[in-house]
Amino acid sequence: MAEPRRALAQMDDARISVGNARFLIIEAPYYEDIAAQLRAGAEAALTRAQARFDVVSVPGALEIPIALAIALDRAPALYQGAIALGCIIRGETYHFEIVANESARALTQLVVERKLPFGNGILTVETETQALERASVESGDKGGDAARAALALYRFSQEFGQVVEQAQIQAQRPVLTSGAR
């Protein structure tokens, strides 16, 4: 099987420096050792990009979307991006599908509606071994990938805003025609 392209892992965090932008990391440390690795990767990527960040914890992955909604409602201008971190390991019941699908659906809906740069670092795996491999900063670094995704979207929003401003300025300039009568 071919190795997936690791575009996010290969990004130079310093190249996507975001100055004083502030990001919110919301973690669900249900599996503490996995959460610690995810958080370490996310914090390292944000630090290299010179971003400021806060970390809050909630009991589980289903609580991450409501925590993000509360944070955005209570402090709408405080955060320029967010990162969700957690781990859902398949068990013997349908609970895995509910938690995985509903947390992803709610987060996607929220960040699209709010147009918030976001990185989803909630692992959905079959085993704890898979989770540890993906979370480890040395191997999978999915926490770092989630932070880099949020950083890249933040940069995109800033750069696209500049493109739009330039286009609007160009559109307002009078058109000079030659040969006027």
Curated annotation (Swiss-Prot):
It comes from the Bacteria. This is 6,7-dimethyl-8-ribityllumazine synthase. The keyword Nucleus does not apply. 5-amino-6-(D-ribitylamino)uracil binds at residues 30, 61-63, 87-89, 120. SUPFAM superfamilies: Lumazine synthase. Keywords: Riboflavin biosynthesis, Transferase. Pathway: Cofactor biosynthesis; riboflavin biosynthesis; riboflavin from 2-hydroxy-3-oxobutyl phosphate and 5-amino-6-(D-ribitylamino)uracil: step 1/2. It comes from Beijerinckia indica subsp. indica (strain ATCC 9039 / DSM 1715 / NCIMB 8712). GO terms for biological process: riboflavin biosynthetic process. Pfam families: DMRL_synthase. Catalyzes the formation of 6,7-dimethyl-8-ribityllumazine by condensation of 5-amino-6-(D-ribitylamino)uracil with 3,4-dihydroxy-2-butanone 4-phosphate. This is the penultimate step in the biosynthesis of riboflavin. It catalyses: (2S)-2-hydroxy-3-oxobutyl phosphate + 5-amino-6-(D-ribitylamino)uracil = 6,7-dimethyl-8-(1-D-ribityl)lumazine + phosphate + 2 H2O + H(+). PANTHER family: 6,7-DIMETHYL-8-RIBITYLLUMAZINE SYNTHASE, 6,7-DIMETHYL-8-RIBITYLLUMAZINE SYNTHASE DMRL SYNTHASE LUMAZINE SYNTHASE. (2S)-2-hydroxy-3-oxobutyl phosphate binds at residues 92-93, 134. GO terms for molecular function: 6,7-dimethyl-8-ribityllumazine synthase activity. The gene is ribH. The active site is at residue 95. Belongs to the DMRL synthase family. One of its GO terms (cellular component) is cytosol. Its EC number is 2.5.1.78.
